[in-house]
């Protein structure tokens, strides 16, 4: 009996394993077009080849049968909350857990941008040894991004960029084949990579999102001729930059073929800014000034694995995605405006090789960096919206005949900066804190949240608040306060019925006013912010006009808006709304129309519940009111606090002449109503040398899990 059971188990495992890449049973519900599911045998010319890129898709060598495999995966960043790119230091155990979760999400591919920690490859090897359905890897190869700006030319006289690129190519190939003990990685001088994972590698992607100016500078080398290599060659139309890429790709294929008798599909990264199309209604010249056309790079018969194209494609930027008429007017099969799908269809016509969307993502940050004409914004989305919108974008990708779609990203990373937030990074990454207003920090399917656990669930209940956190106990109110790395939390308990607005003044740097002329309230300390609570209307955080970074940056410094000189005067008694900038002025050439600069009120608070276990959970909300109890979580960034563990705040920019930083030891907070002279109480900020965090799977995870079942 035991023997029969064992045989049945083995047979079941074999069946499951084969089904990972077979396409014999494509159901009616499958998202992907039912075509080109297999190809004839591949002439491997004595090489080890597990994947080929051919026609529209990738094909996997399943015991000499070449079955189509749709690449559905996630981009994995290098870091966790308190590590940085120089020393990512993610553990083996964490990688093992992530691979399991990714596989259970019904994804089959992990994409990385560059060489990873040795523990990544060890965990990848160990996971795949035991997995019924091994994960595939898309390995990125880049060079120091600073070269894009410091050198600014791929064909510089000293060959700085080319040498760095070649070195990374060689190191990466050796690592993939488990033959490297010479690569410096973070704090590891000689990192050891000893597992050959090449059979799981579906492709290499060379390069970065190329700045237009970098490409133009390279193309100025008009004496650079087309490149003709052993495996790749340029067409006669190739630009100097495309010649450079061709050479780098040829060196990769040559090194791997000659050193390891292995060939793997290769692509060159591109993005919408340098795509091969012209976008006549793009308002910003630098977003449509130069093209990188990898169709000017061809493979010869010696390269059997095949080239593919890889592009990062987002729905909200560049602006032509919102304003190109033929894209906005396009209706998908559901009758919905779908500029993303229209662009995908337009783009794919440019290629004779399989095309992969190397990045597509939507952040659940509180802050918004760009707005989409159909609501697929860069930020400000709920986790449910993230999941639903991503499935819509992926459907457009797969239905349009793309070979794969890689979600950006698996985990949130706290080091990332966004163009419309004040940039700050502590010297010691171990005390880094999150900025929930930064869209770049909110893309992950894995939420990386402040604190060892969630210290306060905004739900209008006081069971999480202790007497030690009660800072004011008056005849009318109880005010509680606590904080973690991401937020200042407040709870208010009303002891009697209050019909009017309630005000909570907050002093951080202490450069604000001691009165509010509009609301008829005064304070015993200079107050930088006022939390204006309206139980029956809008609740918002206001800033003293003098301490408004929005007005200082976009009015006083950049002149985007007319500036009120009264805002540069201390103790004016003027408190203004907190705004977030999302777009400069735009002139649309096709429409002959100018759109004014765009911004929104980021200090307007949203009502809801932040308990992930509640069916009413909403990650974008700020406060909740239940009878006479109110709870708030205020992002530190809205208070100009850049790092709560160090008490780092934005300094007095008018006095300093620029945005810089200083440290404070305490906050001061009070509570009152119109006509009051409010007494402020001190809250000490305790210095921490090690920030804490916890992780959880966002609500989007389950949505994607159900969706990806249908992608075969």
Feature names for model-found ranges:
Residues 371-375, 385, 396-403, 407-471, ...:
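Aromatic-rich peripheral "rim/lid" segments of glycoside hydrolase catalytic domains that contact
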Residues 144, 152-156, 171-239, 260-272:
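Active-site groove signature of glycoside hydrolases
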Residues 16-19:
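C-terminal motif of bacterial Sec signal peptides marking the signal peptidase cleavage site
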Residues 281-373:
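Glycoside hydrolase catalytic-domain groove-lining segments
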Residues 37-130:
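Active-site-adjacent substrate/metal-binding segments within catalytic domains
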Residues 92-173, 248-259, 264, 329-334, ...:
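Aromatic-lined substrate-binding rim segments of carbohydrate-active enzymes
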Residues 471-588, 650-674:
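Surface-exposed, glycine/proline- and aromatic-rich loop segments on solvent-exposed faces
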Residues 460, 487-495, 628-636:
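Short, well-ordered beta-strand segments enriched in hydrophobic/aromatic residues
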